[in-house]
Each structure stands twice: as structure tokens, then as C-alpha cells.
């Protein structure tokens, strides 16, 4: 495939030129040959990488339903995501284990690629557990992590932990040898967070949500992540984080910012009542809350929505694309995706100047 005359995202900026690819990217620049597509006025960007998504279109990875996996892969691709981490809820080990088996055994027919698992629970603190059932919380447990990772076929790429809980620091030290460890759903202080980062943690789960806010005398995880050089997630639906704070985080953290969807099964679905980890949530005007409360419960947006939102909030398009593709791939060690370079997977999006999706390629195949 040869696409010509596009604005191609390479590194951290756009260049005018052409791109040739098969299953992998073969060449970028001014290329000889007749174009298969003259994409003048369009952008070619890396396929988006969502490292924090629980589900969509009525499906949730924690359900452990094999028949739900392909519809999810198709949904993600249709909304610009070419690689994702299947993200779990805070549930009992006996519920998470069969869900790990389903993810392990999934072989997509088409759509986005499942690049692994994000264990967002159950190693959370009570006070910052979010929209999760308290009875399913568990102290950080290295042996449990290894059992769940084995059940997934060794596919856990990211795990969220409250490092201040009993056993939390040892968990960080040991598990960071296996996958990326993120601090989140935590009551940790600045000093505790800095110790965890020194022990091997390198990421923060949905910054500002599920942690103490930034205080000038108690800076907490938010400042620690900045000082430690950690990558940080943001839910950019316009509900979880004010646009001014998104701009602030972008200015402070730069290319360590990771856009995520944190999407639930309600994404791509109408408003109504849905189930989340054994609890009821209500979605109204796209806002998901625990039923009868104002407690936010994840989002209903796609990653492409997040990109469009942050551009609307004032971020440069190049920075938005980087934060939704290259940065998350780097954060969780996905080496073959997330950027446009020769030899990497031809996971590509073509967007028009309104950021509407014109084409999606996964391993060079149009979806």
C-alpha cells in the first residue's frame, strides 16, 4: 500500500510525504511509484494504544465471556484503537482467573489487537477504591499476581497498586521485574510514592482520580509522579478532569502524558443502567455514575474522542497523537506499535482535517 501527500506523524511531529507499508511499515518520505491513495489534506498517525479500557458495546473483560472479545476488538478498531490492554475490575481471584483464561485464549479474526492485560484491581485502598465493591479489595499479594499472570498466559503488562497498603512496597519491588507497576486507587503520601517509584513503579493510574488531590503542603502522588519521571494517565472526557487541569498536566509532564479511555461496557451504548463489577451504574448524557450517587464510574468515550477533546481543550494535535499512541506504548513496553517507523507494525489511522476517521489499518490490513 502506498499513501501519498499526507501529513505523517513521525517521532513527535508531522511531515508532508508518503508512506509505503505491507504488514509492517516499509518506507516513509518522498517515495517513487503510483499512489494507491492520494491523501492530500489528511493525517496518517499511529494506531491509538489504550492501556486502560474495561470494555464497550455491552461487554466487559471481567465478565470472562469468550463471545464478547471479538465485538470489543471490532469496536476499538472502529474508533481508532489498534492495540489495547484488557483492563479488569476489582473482583475476587476466582472471578478474575477465568477472565484471564478468556483473554489468553482469544485469537482475533479482525479488529484491534489485545496487547495484554491491565490488572487495575484488586490491590486498592479502601478510601480510594472508586466505583468498586469493598468486599473484593485485597492487600497487595505477589503470589496472587503471579497466579493471575500465569492464568493470562503471562500477558499482564500493567498492574495498579496502592503501595501504602501492607505488603505494597515489596509488591512493587518484585512485580516491577515482571511488568509495569502503576500507583493508583491509593492514599499514599508523597514520600510513600517516591519510595515506590524508587523501588520500580513507573506509572500513575488516571492522575487526580482515585488519589488525594494536589495540596501545597501534602503534594502526594501527583507531585511525586512528576518528580520521579513517571508516566501518567488522564481520562479526558471533560467530566473527570477540568480542561484547565489537562492543560496543566500537559505542561508539567510533557511527553509522559498518556491519554486513556477508562471506558466501561456503556461505551458505544445508549444512556441507561449497566452493571460494573457487581454494582449498578447509571449513564445519563454520557456520564457514568454509581446508581443513585455522584460517584464517577469510568467513562463512555473512545480514545479518538479523547484526542479530539484535548485538541479542543488547547493541546497541539501532535502532542495529542503522541499521548494516545507512542507514550502509552512506551509506558507498558509495547515495542512494535505506537509509532511510525520502518519495521514496526503497520497499525495506522488516516484522519481528515476534522479528525474524522477515514481508514484504519491493523498489521497493514484495512479494517
Where in the sequence are the language-model features?
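Active-site gating loops and adjacent loop-to-helix segments of metal-dependent hydrolytic enzymes
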Residues: 74-85, 126-153, 195-207, 218-231, ...
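Conserved, mostly hydrophobic/aromatic
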Residues: 41, 119, 175, 204, ...
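His/Asp/Glu-enriched, well-ordered alpha-helical/loop segment
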Residues: 223-232, 250-263, 267-351
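Histidine-rich, glycine-flanked metal-binding segment
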Residues: 1-45
Amino acid at each position: 500500500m502506498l499513501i501519498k501527500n499526507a501529513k505523517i506523524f513521525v517521532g513527535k511531529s508531522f511531515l508532508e510525504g508518503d508512506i509505503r507499508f505491507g504488514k509492517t511499515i516499509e518506507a516513509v518520505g518522498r517515495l517513487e511509484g503510483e499512489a494507491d491513495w492520494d491523501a492530500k489534506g489528511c493525517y496518517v498517525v499511529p494506531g491509538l494504544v489504550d492501556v486502560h479500557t474495561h470494555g464497550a458495546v455491552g461487554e466487559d473483560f471481567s465478565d470472562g465471556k469468550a463471545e464478547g472479545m471479538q465485538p470489543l476488538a471490532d469496536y476499538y478498531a472502529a474508533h481508532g484503537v489498534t492495540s489495547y490492554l484488557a483492563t479488569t475490575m476489582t473482583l475476587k481471584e476466582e472471578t478474575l482467573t477465568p477472565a484471564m483464561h478468556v483473554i489468553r485464549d482469544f485469537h482475533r479474526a479482525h479488529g484491534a489487537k489485545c496487547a495484554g492485560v491491565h490488572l487495575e484491581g484488586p490491590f486498592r485502598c479502601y478510601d480510594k477504591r472508586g466505583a468498586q465493591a469493598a468486599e473484593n479489595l485485597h492487600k497487595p499479594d505477589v503470589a496472587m499476581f503471579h497466579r493471575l499472570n500465569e492464568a493470562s498466559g503471562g500477558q499482564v503488562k500493567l498492574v495498579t497498586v496502592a503501595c501504602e497498603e501492607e505488603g505494597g512496597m515489596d509488591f512493587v519491588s518484585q512485580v516491577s521485574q515482571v511488568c509495569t507497576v502503576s500507583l493508583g486507587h491509593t492514599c499514599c503520601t508523597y514520600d510513600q510514592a517516591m519510595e515506590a517509584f524508587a523501588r520500580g513503579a513507573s506509572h500513575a493510574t488516571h492522575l487526580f482520580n482515585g488519589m488525594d488531590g494536589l495540596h501545597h503542603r501534602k503534594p502526594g502522588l501527583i507531585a511525586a509522579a512528576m518528580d520521579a519521571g513517571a508516566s501518567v494517565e488522564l481520562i479526558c472526557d471533560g467530566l473527570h478532569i477540568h480542561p484547565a487541569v489537562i492543560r496543566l498536566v500537559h505542561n508539567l509532564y510533557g511527553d509522559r502524558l498518556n491519554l486513556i479511555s477508562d471506558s466501561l461496557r456503556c461505551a458505544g451504548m445508549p444512556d441507561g443502567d449497566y452493571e460494573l463489577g457487581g454494582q449498578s451504574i447509571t449513564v445519563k448524557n454520557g456520564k457514568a455514575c454509581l446508581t443513585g450517587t455522584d460517584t464517577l464510574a469510568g467513562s463512555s468515550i473512545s480514545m479518538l474522542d479523547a484526542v479530539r477533546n484535548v485538541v479542543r481543550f488547547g493541546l497541539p494535535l501532535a502532542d495529542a497523537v503522541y499521548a494516545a499512541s507512542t507514550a502509552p506504548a512506551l509506558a507498558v513496553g509495547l515495542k512494535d506499535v505506537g509509532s511510525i517507523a520502518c519495521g514496526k507494525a503497520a497499525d495506522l489511522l488516516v484522519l481528515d482535517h476534522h479528525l474524522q476517521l477515514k481508514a484504519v489499518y491493523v498489521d497493514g490490513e484495512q479494517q
